[in-house]
Design a protein with these regions (language model features):
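A glycine-rich phosphate-binding loop feature that marks nucleotide/adenosyl-phosphate handling sites
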Residues: 128-133, 200-209
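Mobile "lid/hinge" segments at catalytic clefts and subdomain interfaces of large enzymes
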Residues: 130, 134, 139-197
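Small-residue-enriched alpha-helical segments and adjacent helix-cap loops
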Residues: 20-149
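Domain-level signature for proteins that mediate thiol-based redox and metal-cofactor handling
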Residues: 244-321
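Generic secondary-structure signature for well-ordered alpha-helical cores
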Residues: 39-42, 46, 74-78, 116, ...
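Short glycine-/aliphatic-rich beta-strand segments at the starts of folded cytosolic domains
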Residues: 4-28, 89-90, 260-261
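Flexible, glycine/charged-enriched surface loops at secondary-structure junctions
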Residues: 46-52, 121-123, 192-205, 224-231
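Extended, compositionally biased intrinsically disordered regions at domain boundaries
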Residues: 1-18, 226-248, 315
Length: 321
């Protein structure tokens, strides 16, 4: 059983170590909170690691210590779906930077308040930069916002990782309220129409012109496009690997799930298995490297008995027939 509010980090010689990563909105931390981090890391022999999402991870921890660590930090366990809004990265903006054009801290903290840990089709990351220098790496975020002299420019579909994608500009020169309103439309559109795919993958599947037209139609009040958004490939056919996939699987409808079945195939052909995978602690179903792995490899990384997992998955598949 995965300890509450922790992530499995490493399995070495059969021993599992875990990490906790408390949420720090905007990457801001008070001195007294920072002191608690140090005290806990020292007491439980943890290692402190700054993350790319402006948080502080405490890693190399034992499962039996996790509950006490959260209590001593004085925080609620950082819970949430793996496929959710994972982070809102914020630069100093006009509050702290001489080059800032807009108040990225105000906007970023409001986006954090609204969306952090909200469940999404895949993991989702935001970046808010107060000027075109884009210190929050906004053009490689699912939703990126960049301040200019004229207002806020909104970008969508960026990502880093093994298959990086630069975001597409959706709108420009918006004020604070319109930026929040447009982002809300983007998030709802993505939630409604996307499969288990990042925003950039979703845009590549339906086309940026279609995405932009639908979103801006609602934003401007001119009416949404009537035709439906194109769905997934027919599940009985051989699937095109998701971008970033490591392995091209051969699973089709009616096949039993085996050790060699690729995660991407399993969740697309048998979506009813998603709760089972999450229940076993395999929540990274939007990660290209994870979805491209055979079940046996993924189970090994998570320290799971693959035979037990296969039985549970096939039971769900059989019940659905």
């Amino acid at each position: 059983m995965l300890p509450k509010g922790a992530n499995l980090q490493k399995i070495r010689n059969g021993n599992k170590t875990y990490a906790v990563t408390p949420h720090l909105p905007g990457g801001f931390v008070k001195p007294e909170v920072l002191e608690k981090y140090a005290q806990v890391a020292r007491k439980y022999e943890g290692t402190l690691k700054l993350t790319s999402a402006q948080r502080i991870m405490i890693t190399n921890l034992k499962a039996e210590d996790i509950e006490s660590i959260w209590a001593e930090l004085g925080m609620q366990p950082a819970m949430g779906f793996a496929n959710c809004v994972r982070s809102v990265k914020v630069c100093p903006g006009i509050a702290f930077c001489k080059r800032g054009k807009q108040d990225s801290v105000k906007l970023g903290l409001e986006l954090d308040r609204r969306y952090i840990k909200k469940e999404m089709p895949s993991r989702m990351k935001f970046g808010v930069s107060g000027c075109p220098n884009s210190c929050s790496e906004s053009v490689i975020k699912d939703v990126g916002i960049i301040g200019t002299e004229a207002g806020w420019d909104v970008y969508v579909g960026g990502s880093a990782g093994s298959h990086p994608r630069l975001a597409d500009k959706l709108a420009e020169s918006l004020d604070y309220d319109d930026t929040l309103r447009l982002v809300d439309i983007v998030v709802r559109y993505y939630q409604k129409h996307a499969d288990i795919e990042r925003v950039g993958q979703f845009i590549d599947r339906i086309g940026f012109a279609r995405f932009q037209a639908d979103v801006l139609a609602e934003f401007t009040g001119t009416g949404a496009v009537e035709s439906p958004v194109t769905g997934s490939p027919v599940s009985s056919e051989k699937l095109t690997p998701m971008p970033g996939a490591l392995t091209e699987g051969t699973l089709v409808v009616g096949d039993p799930i085996t050790q060699g079945s690729v995660i991407a195939d399993i969740i697309r052909i048998y979506p009813q298995t998603i709760p089972v995978l999450r229940g076993f602690g395999m929540g990274c179903l939007g990660c290209p490297s994870a979805t491209g792995e055979p079940l046996e490899k993924a189970a090994g990384i998570h320290g799971l008995a693959v035979e037990e997992l296969i039985v549970a998955l096939n039971e769900v598949v059989l019940r659905g027939k």
